[in-house]
Amino acid sequence: MKKILIGVIGVLIQLAVSGAVYGKVLNVYSPDGTVKVSIELKDKIYYSVFTGDDILLDRCTMGMTLSDGTLGVKPVLRKVRKGTVNESRKREIPLKNETVRNHYNYLRMNMAGDYTVEFRVFDDGVAYRFITDRKTPIEVVGEDFNINFPTDYRACLGEAHAFSTSYESVYTCMQTESYRKDDIMAYLPALLETPGGCKILISEADLTDYPCMFLKSTGNNGMYALFPKCPVRFEDDNDYKFKILEEASYIARTSGKRSFPWRFFVIAKNEKVLVENEMVYKLSAPCELADYSWVKPGKSSWEWWNPRIYDVDFRVGANTQTYKYYIDFAAELGLEYTLMDGAWMAAASDPWTPHPEIDLPEVIRYAKEHNVKILLWLSWLTVEKHFDQLFAKYAEWGVAGLKIDFMERSDQWMVNFYERVAKEAAKHKLVID
């Protein structure tokens, strides 16, 4: 009887807690008070984004579907934590800014089911992510990233006809109410503009061991996310890439104890604020290397981009003299690099043998003499097939870095390839173009 009574009390307490939480609204503001996120816990996790009294995103939903259930459906809130972070981060490699101010208010919702949802609200944007705390690996089948617009927005989108894309299409602008469900999807970033002129940039950050996100129209003045599935069987297609023969049912198989990529919205009154934003840097994990002094950003001459040379006293083409000419050009104009595209190789699949008319050691020596660094082009498939030896050998040759090409994918495998390349290149102090 005592055990039954305790059990009944436990159920009543759980029902009381669930009843108190269902429909609960949690608000978090930016440090300057101009941006607000309103989160509502009902059958799903809903959120809306405001600037002042204006609603920018209306009752959007978020969730993550795993092979054994969905996070964010019928959420049970266990604990809420709010706080403020105000720090300055010195960039390892200064680009727009040497020091970045990272100032935001956060809200962390610890949920039943071993996961947490974290929101960060900045003066110039909003971000959220999922964090899981499971002991065994998990399979992510998909995400519920579903955003709704309160009125007709202007959208500028990089169109992708398939998940295999070079991310090089010209952005197309349209009205969101005209963006139909059967229209092609878009890759990130995507830019929206409200009738009042407010800009909203959609993108992601801290992407590791996970595929890139794409967007598609809901058909009802909104967008939702799609992701490429993880390839499990493939074969060579040509010297540049392979053909995927079979995909998994999931988009990622990954650690069960991790944080997932940030989904963020930069909010800007004008293009100036949009260009100045450092959201990706602020949301990304700290850099792992202690010494970046060898990384030298710079400009490059590149024969593929401008291959026509006239009025010279030598035969123009894939030969030593032509590349020396490009090095002279770079040195004269203060360009830090010369990029040798695919013509430097005897064959695209052979990273060791230069074109017979190119004396590569002489080109590298000549470039060094003129204070210009050499970058070599390679296809990603050639890099992958020679991964263990390639970086060390190129560093030994005196090459400054690599331009790796034709990935044209952003599934989990390929995202991990990007990270493997960056780590191995850094180990040998090679830059990646």
Please give the residue ranges for each predicted region.
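N-terminal accessory beta-strand-rich subdomains and adjacent acidic, glycine-rich linkers
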Residues: 25-282
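Intrinsically disordered, low-complexity acidic regions
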Residues: 244-246, 281, 324, 345-346, ...
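Aromatic- and carboxylate-enriched substrate-binding clefts and catalytic-loop regions
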Residues: 341-433
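Bacterial Sec-dependent N-terminal signal peptides
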Residues: 1-25
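Short amphipathic alpha-helical segments and helix-helix/interface helices
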Residues: 189-191, 327, 364, 421-422
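Short, flexible loop/turn elements at secondary-structure junctions
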Residues: 113, 123, 151, 268, ...
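An acidic-aromatic substrate-binding cleft motif
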Residues: 255-329, 333
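Short loop/turn motifs at secondary-structure junctions
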Residues: 333-334, 398
